[in-house]
């Protein structure tokens, strides 16, 4: 448990930059995506835990997943309403966030005595291999956001925002092709805050 605390304290003290600056539109894009991603990952962990006979862990993750979905729905609704009153600026903010990729707060993840960010890639590989959160989940989230905000039906856009929309409409398909080519390394990673179930 101490190593979990150390990792958490490092994460807090190292801070993170989610790429939104002080732009409220970008912040809402970030939270809409991030909350859906955490819903997906907690829901997947719940399934894995249930399959492994860890009912309490599964139940806890389901509860957290439910909270994440409620947050996602709220932020998604904020953006839907912003699109109604400021479609071009909202489209450009969405475009900027997706073009430069949504980064998770844990990108600087590290263990005790580790370098900043030294753990995130390993953690991501394990999560992808275990089916907790995959590149296909990322693609699915893009598709869901495009559908939730009716990106293809928004009117009154500037020419710049129209170009942004065209990019956003093609992005999920492009990312899906990339996801199909990704090979997750079959390496074993040991984390200080996890004991093998052996």
Language-model features, listed with the residues they occupy:
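Non-heme di-metal
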Residues: 1-198
């Amino acid at each position: 448990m101490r190593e979990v605390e150390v990792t958490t304290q490092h994460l807090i003290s190292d801070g993170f930059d989610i790429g939104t600056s002080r732009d409220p539109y970008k912040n809402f894009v970030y939270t809409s995506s991030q909350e859906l991603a955490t819903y997906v990952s907690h829901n997947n962990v719940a399934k894995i835990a249930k399959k492994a006979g860890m009912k309490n862990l599964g139940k806890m993750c389901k509860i957290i997943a439910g909270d994440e979905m409620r947050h996602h729905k709220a932020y998604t609704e904020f953006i839907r309403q912003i699109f109604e009153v400021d479609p071009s600026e909202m489209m450009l903010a969405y475009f900027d966030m997706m073009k430069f990729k949504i980064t998770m707060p844990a990108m600087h993840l590290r263990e005790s005595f580790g370098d900043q960010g030294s753990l995130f890639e390993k953690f991501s590989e394990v999560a992808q291999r275990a089916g907790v959160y995959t590149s296909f989940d990322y693609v699915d989230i893009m598709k869901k956001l495009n559908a939730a905000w009716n990106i293809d039906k928004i009117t009154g856009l500037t020419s710049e925002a129209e170009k942004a929309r065209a990019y956003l409409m093609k992005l999920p398909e492009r990312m899906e092709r990339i996801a199909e080519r990704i090979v997750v390394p079959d390496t074993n990673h040991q984390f200080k805050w996890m004991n093998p179930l052996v």
